[in-house]
Amino acid sequence: METKLMSFRDTIILAMSEEMRRDENVLLMGEDVGVFGGDFGTSVGMLEEFGPERVRDCPISEAAISGAAAGAAMTGLCPIVDMTFMDFSVIAMDNIVNQAAKTRYMFGGKGQVPITIRCAAGNGVGSAAQHSQSLESWFTHIPGLKVVAPGTPADMKGLLKSSIRDNNPVIILEYKSEFNQKGEVPVDPDYTIPLGVGEIKREGTDVTVVTYGKMLRRVMQAAEELAEEGISVEVVDPRTLVPLDKEIIINSVKKTGKVVLVNDAHKTSGFIGEISAIISESEAFDYLDAPIRRCAGEDVPMPYAQNLENAMIPTVESIKEAIRKTHNKQ
């Protein structure tokens, strides 16, 4: 498969542009998506190609944007919403949770709401407490929503395109600190990744680490460094949180007998707690040789100071230490 080295940012532009060329019903809407090219540069050049009818600059009202998008989706269009910071999605919760997520069910499966809501999540760029949250577990709790958290540029392309083509509302996380990170991306305009299919990012035999999104790069580095210590780490990336590929997680835990769960979101009620419950309630529980361990963000608001911000979420070193303790059955 032919690939090209691309950043997350350029991959997002490519995936949206390919889908807008494929389907004239697809449009992009949000604050500053047109003339400015997106707050994070994720729609640069799209206004020039597709025009203001399909790349729509909107007023600063997330409630209005999400409501207009939900209505457009219900009447045959396929809107992509740039919510900019994920923190701002809370202003749009009624339209996302009570309208978009419930419509198909309340109309007996006859109503479709093909809306993709792109959210810039996580810390790492000095955006402080109101612009640095990872709120995926808020949305995984809501039946009717799909939630996607790509950890590589290739996965971003395949999963974003599948999200746009899906006839249900999808929340997709784009981690701000990763926009400039690069990886090989398939150039095929028909390249997609099915929602609900995870991937083993690294084979191992001693400890399973389940992670997604922003933390994948750090976990992969930790696994590589621990290999020099003789610890073989298997890295499982579910890629999609809802629907979740439970089988790939359970099978890996059965293989290694030990598991560490890593995310950057706050530890309390974070999504990795749900993964822990799934493992505990499955046949994998009988294979465990050590307690399930979580490595997650601290339960405090995100500081602005860089040194404090860096201390807020798992580092390569803290991930390595969690894996070591689990490997040693501590």
Show which residues each predicted segment covers.
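Thiamine diphosphate
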Residues: M1-P169, L173, K176-Q330
